[in-house]
Amino acid sequence: MKVLFVASEAFPLVKTGGLGDVLHGLPQALHGLGVGVRLLLPGYRTLLRQLDQVRIVAWFDVRGAEGPVAARVLETRHPGFDFPLWIVDCPPLFDRPGNPYVDVTGYDWPDNAERFAVFARVAALLAQDAHEAGWLPDVVHTHDWQTGLVPAFLADLPARPRTVFTIHNLAYGGHFPHGDFLRLQLPAHWWSHEGVEFHGGFSMLKAGIVYADAVTTVSPTYAEEICTPAFGYGLDGLLRSRRHKLHGILNGIDSATWDPADDPHLRARYTAGRILPGKRRDKQALLERFLPAADEAALQAPLVGLVGRLVEQKGIDWVLAAMPLLLAETDARFVLLGSGQAAYEQRLTRLARQHPTRVFVEIGYDEALAHQIEAGADMFLMPSRFEPCGLNQMYSLRYGTLPIVFKTGGLADTIVDTNEASLADGSANGFVFDTPDVAHFVDAVRRALALYRQPSLWRRVQQTGMRLSFDWRESAGHYLALYAADSAGEPDV
């Protein structure tokens, strides 16, 4: 089987979030299972600068907003991938500063509709082997709104590969005005309520849902949630009507990169069979980074970690509301790494100044520190209001750092609340609250702090989490089964 992945980012070449991690881990795992893989990416300036040797495999003139747009397709190899990469090199659309979707001031590029429509047109041509390279995919797997037009361009062709569209976050719909639809000269028959039209404009994400042969999202619970008005962003009715072709497949993690037994970022390594000595040394190293005079009392106190975007979706407002209370009534320390809305950054920084021996804050992102927090913290906060899949809770389980999460999306699929029943059957691996407010979040943290004072039970729950597997190979197996069933024309995979 041959699969063409089409996406707007992939780690380590370009990454703005979890999408980039998936577009590294999943294709790599499928390649390891014997699938022929190609990955198509836009030729961003920062991406092209990382490539050493490239060869031109195709030239296309495709329709843009103001007429034909010339695009080269480059083939290259990169140490991060075990298969060839294809890059759409179109300097007027992609050779620019800023990140893939926004300019240096943080605003969306005004021509995003054209950028990703052109990218999708090129992808559709490659999927038909229009460049006559002799590599014709059986499946084209597209990801998020930036690639939603690819299944639409392919849908009406008589002989074509099957298409799969993955929703990583329904909150980002790729919405554009009707004027862009007209300027791009998109097919007129798409413009309907049953097509891409959405509240007077059009949605590239909706195009993927409507025209793909199969639609997936990144956890079973999120697949259920997005079919409801609370999580559907106006597309829940469409998703309910497509429920027979909507599949929730849990993301995996890079088990080699996130491995406490072999992590180069740590002072000490450890395993599920021998947690305490190594994790204690990593906790000490983490404390010493922020508190050089850390004493035994600090080492014995619970250390609570957080790594993530400082935005409301991630529940950072609940964390900020809870911390003064927890600082007053417990001896817990907090270490937080992230960036986001300026108001939240400022409040955290102010809290750290007020409690310099108990609250440690790093604004920004530091890969090594992220690993060190996962290893050195005792528990990990992830109270997201919604979380399509989430990765950090799986990293935390692997590092014996018990997650405290809200019951939503992939968090609900991976974390089992610690209570009398789950302790008895051995499934407990973290702490879950299911009412979205500060009081219930605080209650979950208190329960975690109470269990921390029972070392034998705490160790048992740590070991349960560390022995779980979230390797990408398991997720890849589910996708491979979907590809095979969908290619065979089975509608209810």
From Swiss-Prot:
GO molecular function, one term: alpha-1,4-glucan glucosyltransferase (UDP-glucose donor) activity
Binding site for ADP-alpha-D-glucose: 15
Keyword Kinase carried by entry: no
One of the protein's GO biological processes: glycogen biosynthetic process
Pathway linked to the protein: Glycan biosynthesis; glycogen biosynthesis
EC number: 2.4.1.21
Superkingdom of origin organism: Bacteria
InterPro entries: Glyco_trans_1, GS/SS, Starch_synth_cat_dom
Family: Belongs to the glycosyltransferase 1 family. Bacterial/plant glycogen synthase subfamily.
Name of protein: Glycogen synthase
Organism taxonomic ancestry: Bacteria, Pseudomonadati, Pseudomonadota, Betaproteobacteria, Nitrosomonadales
Gene encoding the protein: glgA
